Amino acid sequence: MKTKYSCLNREKRVTDQKLGVRPRLSATPCGYILPMSGYEEEVQERWGDTEAYAQSQSRTSKYTHEDFAAAKVDQEAATELFVYAFGNSLPTTSEKAQAAVVAHRVAISKWFYECSIEMQKNLALMYVQDPRFKKYYDGRVNGLAQYVHDAIMAQ
């Protein structure tokens, strides 16, 4: 088993090197590279009256630093699935790309709020329209934001 695991890690490292993937090592409260401080007013204005916002506030208000780190790990795992699919030029409708879509939605639902397919599609629009979110994905691999968007929209 150890050999198989080592081979998978080597394969991932080679793929990452080919793509120029830049790893993310820090945990952030919302699971994205965006720091929460400085955005509270914008978040409140845009989503403050939604059920998702209330659910997220209720959940995260009880989280410890370890909880936020675990949420980050789950979201990074979903992002890595997108990186793999994109890096291997898989269609956005492929089984691997759609597994990344599901992992993305599950991570959000687990840690923040129930994320419906419709809600996830709204997030996908934000990933390509908001430069801050686009930078998060394209900071990993150039073009990843559009791929994530397209994969989510393809479900």
Question: Locations of the language-model features?
Answer:
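Amphipathic alpha-helical "stalk" segments
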Residues: 2-155
